[in-house]
Structure formats: C-alpha cells, structure tokens
Amino acid sequence: MGGLKKPKKKYLAGKPKKIWNKQLLLEELQLMGEYGLRNKKELWLARARLKWIVRRARALLSMTAEERAPLEVPFKEKLYKMGFIEDPNVPLDRILSLDVRAILERRLQTLVFRMGLAKSIHHARQLVVHGHVLVAGRRVTSPGFLVPRELEDKITIEQ
C-alpha cells in the first residue's frame, strides 16, 4: 500500500516572493477591488494559471518548427475556448504578453457583473455564492469558475 501524497497548494506558483513589496501590495489591492476578490489566494490562483500558460508558450517557442507544429494548434485552441485569447491564430508572442486580468475576466463573478446581471461586482459574487446563477442550466456556486467561451452566453439568473 502506498502512502498518500502530501497535498500541495495550487497557488504557490502565483504567490509573490516578497509579500511586503509596497508596489505589489498596492497593485494586488487594486485588482482585488476591481474584480471583487475575497482574498489574495484567489489572485494568486489566477497568477499561477497564467504562469502555467506562459511557461507552456515559452517551451513551445524554444522548440523547432517541426516539433512545435503538432503541439501549438491544440494549445492555442484551448486558450481560445477558455476565452484567454481573442483569436486562435495569434502568434505565441502575444500569449507571452497576457496578464492576470485576462484570467480574472473569465471568472463567473466578473462575467455576471459585465453582462449587467448584477448591480456591482460584490452583488455578482453574492448571486453566485447563493446559487442564483445558472450556467447552461446547471447551478454554479463558485465565483472563481472559469467560464469557457461557448458557455458565456448561457449564463442566466434564477430568482
């Protein structure tokens, strides 16, 4: 019988090395207010996801054209389906220039607010947490749910 793996935190890749950097603190505070994040862990999770995307794009850029071709198209299509890029034919350099806002814009909480279904970003979070938001007919209670592009227009409010 094997032992259980020690659980790892999923946000460590996005956690800053120097937590008490004043400029970073102000930037994080501004992002938390703009996107209605409850704590910095939510921001760090988004940064970790972005870091994974950038690392993958950088690895693809370092490959030769023959090695890159079969891997590049599915990677770009996945990013397009998730809504992180606006066109599946963008060059890899544009993927490297993504920032954390691209990830935060795809959160269910943000999309509910941007669609005008809630009065404020905090109201959107409350609607999601209390189970009033349906995505393609299914109740989603996680405000951090990353909405794929195909489900974006299937977000509804149930009162």
Swiss-Prot record:
Pfam families: S4
Claim: rRNA-binding is one of the keywords in the record: yes
InterPro entries according to UniProt: Ribosomal_uS4, Ribosomal_uS4_arc, Ribosomal_uS4_CS, Ribosomal_uS4_euk/arc, Ribosomal_uS4_N, S4_RNA-bd, S4_RNA-bd_sf
An example Gene Ontology CC term for this record: small ribosomal subunit
Biological process according to GO: ribosomal small subunit biogenesis; translation
Subunit composition and interactions: Part of the 30S ribosomal subunit. Contacts protein S5. The interaction surface between S4 and S5 is involved in control of translational fidelity.
HAMAP family: Ribosomal_uS4_A
Name of the featured protein: Small ribosomal subunit protein uS4
Species of origin: Pyrobaculum calidifontis (strain DSM 21063 / JCM 11548 / VA1)
Source lineage: Archaea, Thermoproteota, Thermoprotei, Thermoproteales, Thermoproteaceae
